[in-house]
Amino acid sequence: MAREIHKIASLRRESSLWRRGDDGVYFSRSSTGASSSRFRDEEDDEEALRWAALERLPTRDRVRRGILLQAAEGNGEKVEVDVGRMGARESRALIARLIRAADDDHALFLLKLKDRMDRVGIDYPTIEVRFEKLEVEAEVHVGNRGLPTLLNSIINTVQAIGNALHISPTRKQPMTVLHDVSGIIKPRRMTLLLGPPGSGKTTLLLALAGKLEDNLKVSGKVTYNGHGMDEFVPQRTAAYISQHDLHIGEMTVRETLAFSARCQGVGSRYDMLTELSRREKAENIKPDQDIDVYMKASAIGGQESSVVTEYILKILGLDICADTVVGNDMLRGVSGGQRKRVTTGEMLVGPARALFMDEISTGLDSSTTYQIVNSIGQTIRILGGTAVISLLQPAPETYNLFDDIILLSDGQIVYQGAREHVLEFFELMGFRCPQRKGVADFLQEVTSKKDQEQYWYRNDIPYSFVPVKQFADAFRSFHVGQSIQNELSEPFDRSRSHPASLATSKFGVSWMALLKANIDRELLLMKRNSFVYIFKAANLTLTAFLVMTTFLRTKMRHDTTYGTIYMGALYFALDTIMFNGFAELGMTVMKLPVFFKQRDLLFFPAWTYTIPSWILQIPVTFFEVGVYVFTTYYVVGFDPNVSRFFKQYLLLVALNQMSSSLFRFIAGIGRDMVVSQTFGPLSLLAFTALGGFILARPDVKKWWIWGYWISPLSYAQNAISTNEFLGRSWNKSFPGQNDTVGISILKSRGIFTEAKWYWIGFGALIGYTLLFNLLYTVALSFLKPLGDSYPSVPEDALKEKRANQTGEILDSCEEKKSRKKEQSQSVNQKHWNNTAESSQIRQGILPFAQLSLSFNDIKYSVDMPEAMTAQGVTEERLLLLKGVSGSFRPGVLTALMGVSGAGKTTLMDVLAGRKTGGYIEGDITISGYPKKQETFARISGYCEQNDIHSPHVTVYESLVFSAWMRLPSEVDSETRKMFIEEVMELVELTSLRGALVGLPGVNGLSTEQRKRLTVAVELVANPSIIFMDEPTSGLDARAAAIVMRTVRKTVDTGRTVVCTIHQPSIDIFEAFDELFLMKRGGEEIYVGPLGQNSSKLIEYFEGIEGISKIKDGYNPATWMLEVTSTTQEEMLGIDFSEIYKRSELYQRNKELIQDLSTPTPGSTDLHFPTQYSRSFFTQCIACLWKHKLSYWRNPSYTAVRLLFTIIIALLFGTMFWDLGRKTKKEQDLFNAVGSMYAAVLYIGIQNSGCVQPVVVVERTVFYRERAAGMYSGFPYAFGQVAIELPYILVQTLVYGVLVYSMIGFEWTVAKFIWYLFFMYFTLLYFTFFGMMAVGLTPNESIAAIISPAIYNAWNLFSGYLIPRPKIPVWWRWYCWICPVAWTLYGLVASQFGNIQTKLDGKDQTVAQFITEYYGFHHDLLWLVAVVHVVFTVMFAFLFSFAIMKFNFQRR
């Protein structure tokens, strides 16, 4: 865009701005290329005329038009097109012509782009990034002080307040994340960023991209082409690509990238294209037509479908899944590897010239990683970009694609410079990379205290640990380091900076274009989430039916007796419509992580996001409110005047808009599901209690009257009541009185009697709608996402980090012990294969049976997907495994490999018995006996890829629980603890024993620590057979080596282990004994030994005619996947599966399977006297123990709920102050009953809502643990239910004591105990109902949608809005099964059911009024108490039943 860099004064003038460059000229004219590109005599006359006509257009029009071939094959008609109106189909066809195969044609395509610019002397903008003496410091909690327990959360809150008021200092300790780092990132060079976990890689990338958080202490400077960060907009000049994949799951891959491209704009491409077009015209140069169309289409911003989107889809290999939804935890979408590529592509579609990419290869196989990095490298080198890429386990061939290396360790730069000199530097330091070791793997390990010694090659000097500071100091004196220092000492010549290099405008396109983009996306998401709106409409329809049949006009007269009932119907309408907006809260919170990411990347300002979410809901509101009002108004018997009908309709529309805006605002400030689900009901309760229905305006205390005037519901109540009761139906007068029936009813409830209050109320609701939307916009504009980027760290880890940064050598007894242990644990191939040394898991203490697993002709199929059936596929089932056979044996480590879609995880799930659906055929035997899943679960372990663990327990507690549940009961407690310690030492988790597990990507353990915990959780079960699904995915080389060393040691104890693996390095791949290789479609193509240095594998495939030989030093795993690809099969005309089945190897495997399928003489089948290792009672105790820890360390649930309760207690206590003693008037009793009704309903709903996210998280863990045979469903449900009892008891006591004393109910032991009893069981059954709703539904969203429908029914039939004696006889039965009705019965009857004082002006006692008006009898309290217990037990039982019987996990 012109505004983004500089406005070109006149594109027809030879502006000096566009011509100065490194030597004073940016765009030098080329004299050599022009003649070769002039019109040729033999060109087609018609085409020449068409081009000539296009050339005659003004430059502004010419850059929007091009000549496009209408068919991808190249033989179609050429037509003139407006590139701004090209559709997705034309864009795909164009890209298909330009880049037929990304591997072969991408570089040629880029060279064509560059050649076109070179011919007229235009350079692409470049950026040189410099960072000098950069220091980043964070404040962290150390040790157990950082665990988020209930106590710690309270202390943290108090200290944070004290710190903000400068009363008390912070108790956090400083931790240096980056220490004195300096360097230069050159354009046209690919830079690889390496370093062990915690080295500061992500922080460095964020610092270079200008995205560091404000709460960090930062010193030093980062410059782009000599310009400081405050001189341009770094978020738009550079693109930071996060390691976390945050996307809207309902959008397809193409839609996600297209939206990103639409928001980011085209940068300087339009200005450069205009200059290019002007120069080409001046020199009579005709460009390649496809290149011309591409460059013009890519320079037009704001398009719904962009040619750049199609280009990025192509080079990232996402074109095959472009129309598949991205998906999330609740919606199946693309694979994890594809989702990672979507994250990368989301930023590549933009115009940023500098790329900072954080772990972009997680979940990708090595060949895909190579292709993506190669494509990015081609773009960087040819078009002059700048890139720093952090990779976890780069294969040697991927490593060789980089020009420069930055090695970071403990926040210091150990090396930065050309790749060719890195090994030279470390050899000078005394360390040498072994021959078959990847250089990247060597670099990740050489600075680690645990791995360093194995690489020491100086025999003349004894090894001593070299700390990071010593490396960093040595690098500064190394010739590469000196060269960087010399270059940094001379400032960058800012005059060399291309005017288009740095972005100076905050956003990529105009505000209106961004608003339109967000409107289009919101419409798309509303369409994709249409089931939510359908369900809300259905819920309103059901509620309307209940209202019509409960408040039936034929049963109600228009007099003062039934005026209260009509008032209840109006209030219920307000309550229903108000609560209808509650669904916005959950939907808003779920979209916020993506919003915050895109806001911080400057995709759009917050208001362009918030306005569509409000405006587009208005038509929906009109429809939803219409469903309710149009069906109920005349049936209930409201005033028949048409104008009053439409006025009620408009008022409820305004109320619904206000409600939706309120809950969006609460979601915006809460930013967390549990917190928002807590404060949502709190606001609803406050507005309702002060709305004038529960407590009439004259009875509101003077200190709360301001609350009445700011409550939106008070205005709604006045408006809807005056609209109804000033109508003709209520216009009858009492004899001898001036007031009509309607006015009398209004006065009795303290409601204004003037007609103007309708319009005052309506205006107030519109005002509140605008206010809440404004506050929502402000919240999203300035608030940051919740979460701590730098959580607590163990004390030892912080000491070691500081020692490495200062060069200090820790010297203590503990250090000497750990040094000895570390030396014995060095990552060494020789050590991996040393069986004698590796039998660390004590077979003597915990013996196990050595078991083999064989399988023959395994087929797995699923019902044919509807999408394929729609495409004409006639088969009923889709076959995913096609007769797979093989065997896994004790002491043999088998790698299960294949490209994505080969069926690796599917086969493993089938063998492990983890499939929940589909059809399985074939034979599986365990040491010769048919596999029985009940016994197999006892002797097997399964390390899932997703690392699912309870987030609120520590590492040690996770292992204790697993061992407790899975080891035989004969193993005593001491032996079990010793075994756990042994496993922790083996997997190197000892230093993390007290670390909280946390949620992936949010807090707690890092990816590699979580992966090691997954392995350890299975190892402590002492299994005979272990399945591991991608145990090294997402890990760096050193962490992968730790995991594989653990696996190797496990195998060497005699266990049977099989691992699926994606992109192994050479040494990790060759740590395996055998390979089970599958191809896409679910067939095996090699099953056999690897051999020394993979010799047998290489010999087998090189023996196939046409297969290329492996190059020296090449990774056999990568080579194997490349030569067996589908493309290779098509090129060679062979089928690797058929070749394997004709081989001698296949025959030998068949014989082995036959042998292993026959029991050995004297052996017996697996048998256990019980299904589970532990007794039912022990399972219950263990599950309760784990839930106790989880609840104590989940303050966002327990502490926030308690805080909510205290606030409500104080609110109600002060609002209804001393009303419990007032029993002289009916209104006094209505007020007291109203306080009970509101408390029960809203605190109960809050309990029910906020427990649901907690249950959802733990249920996912439960599915894994139950599948592992740890326990049955009931003990888990028992633990979840039982742990709520003490927490709700505290909640009840806090609420009960405060409210009972402040409201002034009668202080007798019986009444107080009854009050606490009914409140306790009410909160229990509401909480258990929330659990039950989750247990019976697939996910939290469905539970949150279904629950309000139940709450509505409970509210309506509670006995407050319409007393039970006045409920129509056909609905009266429901009162007996409505729990809230029983709660109100118990509370009211226990407090007022035995008061014999008479009401003022009536010959009726309080007890008689309670009995006659409400139908409550004091002498039936025992029955009410029993019913409360029954409801509580019933909901708990239904939750337990759902947990035991339903499995919503789909595998």
UniProtKB/Swiss-Prot annotation:
Which SUPFAM superfamilies does the UniProt entry name for this protein? P-loop containing nucleoside triphosphate hydrolases
Q: Quote a single Gene Ontology cellular component term.
A: membrane
The protein's matches in PANTHER family, at most eight in alphabetical order, are given as: PLEIOTROPIC DRUG RESISTANCE PROTEIN 1, PLEIOTROPIC DRUG RESISTANCE PROTEIN 1-LIKE ISOFORM X1
Q: Where does ATP 2 bind?
A: 898-905
| Family named by the database record | Belongs to the ABC transporter superfamily. ABCG family. PDR (TC 3.A.1.205) subfamily.
Protein's cellular compartments: Membrane
Q: Which UniProt keywords apply?
A: ATP-binding, Membrane, Nucleotide-binding, Repeat, Transmembrane, Transmembrane helix, Transport
Q: Which residues span the membrane?
A: 531-551, 563-583, 618-638, 650-670, 674-694, 760-780, 1197-1217, 1237-1257, 1285-1305, 1312-1332, 1342-1362, 1373-1393, 1423-1443
Which parts of the sequence belong to the ABC transporter domain?
A: 162-435, 853-1105
Q: What is its main location?
A: membrane
Asked whether the UniProt record includes Protein biosynthesis among its keywords, one would answer no
Domain (ABC transmembrane type-2): residue spans on this chain: 513-725, 1178-1392
The annotated region (Disordered) lies at 809-835
Q: Which residues bind ATP 1?
A: 195-202
One GO term in the molecular function aspect is: ATP binding
Q: What is this protein called?
A: ABC transporter G family member 32
Q: What is the topology of this protein in the membrane according to its UniProt annotation? A: Multi-pass membrane protein
The protein's role, per its UniProt record: May be a general defense protein.
Compositional bias segments (type: Basic and acidic residues): 813-823
Q: Does the keyword Membrane apply?
A: yes
